[in-house]
């Protein structure tokens, strides 16, 4: 295997993990360790008409490719930038007569690039797609069946005039996608819109309490001169001080679960046994399953309440999928009432309920009640998450907005400031989310100052402003969680 070179990091053999990356210099919180453009990336099947196929921004009006009628772009700039990667895809779709699923499209794009450039390492690339882990040998019976279907479909889609690859190599690429696919989000970071392969990122090992985070940046093509454009990329950012020689890690999954469940999830999705400190020592497990102290409920009562919470979550998922949001609120209220005397405020079953009910009530514009639940949710999250966790920052931001809409100006402003401080580390000052949050911070600070000077006049102006302004910050509730870092084929 050929290993490339890159400033700031180097490949090494991590004990018990295989390959990994370590820092070659010292880093501090918010430092960008490296940025990487996608080797190949595609939009999810369900969003191909709503998301630009170049920068992955969600837009209302998109330009459609006049030949295949499939690809969509923000403008001519994005369409021109996409042509190198879309050219083969365009003719293949026309020949095949239909559009294959996202996995097939991504595999084809990867192999067209291999055909075009070979598998040698380019500048700044540490590893080729040929040398990424595929874990095909660990696939279960169902996964092997899905793989055979994908390979068969790929062979029908792949043009006969293109370079022909072996079945083993095609299977390897599908395995790479399965294990190394990175979720791409829209420009607001609120919705997963696609999946991409970033070879250097594939070398960064997992830790449930990592020292880095990965953020997707859609880039910016708004400047008139192309020399000022920035490209779509991922950024590996430091969450705190990282010493020279220290291994760089990210979390492949959400931390908010007990260690055994996280280990089970990692084994199922990524085929390894997590040996991080938090899993080995079961750190914070007592908080995740926390119960009230005085009086302390019996083990039998706790067991029954956990099962009741799981059953209620299933009912909630069904109601949400059917758009029955008032039913969701009713189920959450009933469950929280029963959880209250049993679970502590950090219990994951209570936090899941608080998250759902605050989100749905915000969507229904019942902001006063939503703000109460959102504050409780944030209080629990702050005791569990890493202080610079991106998901914590997003949750605090949403809670701050909910409280602002409820008229809790001081609480809302405080939360927005806290979220802004976190996102400066995890996303950086130039990310669209951080820019939006900075605008909100300035606005709430101005309103807070006005509120303290003349409360009566403030409420008159606020009422007038809200009546003339459509809601833009509360999206329709979704069964999908916040976008996960790494994409797992459903």
UniProtKB/Swiss-Prot annotation:
PROSITE patterns in the cross-refs: SET, ZF_MYND_1, ZF_MYND_2
GO function term, MF aspect, one: zinc ion binding
Expression triggers: By serum response factor SRF and myogenin. SRF binds to the CArG site and MYOG binds to the E-box element on SMYD1 promoter.
A single GO BP: methylation
Residues annotated for Zn(2+) 1 binding in this entry: 52, 55, 74, 78
GO cellular component: cytoplasm; nucleus
Zinc finger regions, MYND-type: 52-90
Tissues and organs where the protein is expressed, per its UniProt entry: Expression seems mostly restricted to heart and skeletal muscle.
Gene3D superfamilies cross-referenced by the UniProt entry: 1.10.220.160, 1.25.40.970, 6.10.140.2220, SET domain, Tetratricopeptide repeat domain
Binding site for Zn(2+): 208, 274, 276, 279
Annotated positions binding Zn(2+) 2: 65, 68, 86, 90
Key words, A-Z: Cytoplasm, DNA-binding, Metal-binding, Methyltransferase, Nucleus, Repressor, S-adenosyl-L-methionine, Transcription, Transcription regulation, Transferase, Zinc, Zinc-finger
Stretches assigned to the SET domain: 7-253
Matches recorded under CDD domains: SET_SMYD1
Subcellular location field: Cytoplasm; Nucleus
Sequence positions that bind S-adenosyl-L-methionine: 17-19, 135, 205-206, 270-272
Record carries keyword S-adenosyl-L-methionine: yes
Enzyme Commission code(s) on record: 2.1.1.354
Catalyses which reaction(s): L-lysyl(4)-[histone H3] + 3 S-adenosyl-L-methionine = N(6),N(6),N(6)-trimethyl-L-lysyl(4)-[histone H3] + 3 S-adenosyl-L-homocysteine + 3 H(+)
Family as reported in the entry's similarity comment: Belongs to the class V-like SAM-binding methyltransferase superfamily.
Subunit text: Interacts with HDAC1, HDAC2 and HDAC3. Interacts (via MYND-type zinc finger) with NACA isoform skNAC.
Described function: Methylates histone H3 at 'Lys-4' (H3K4me), seems able to perform both mono-, di-, and trimethylation. Acts as a transcriptional repressor. Essential for cardiomyocyte differentiation and cardiac morphogenesis.
The record's note on its domains: The SET domain is split between the S-sequence (residues 1-49) and the core SET domain (residues 181-258), however the two segments still come together to form a conserved SET domain fold.
Entry protein name: Histone-lysine N-methyltransferase SMYD1
Organism: Homo sapiens
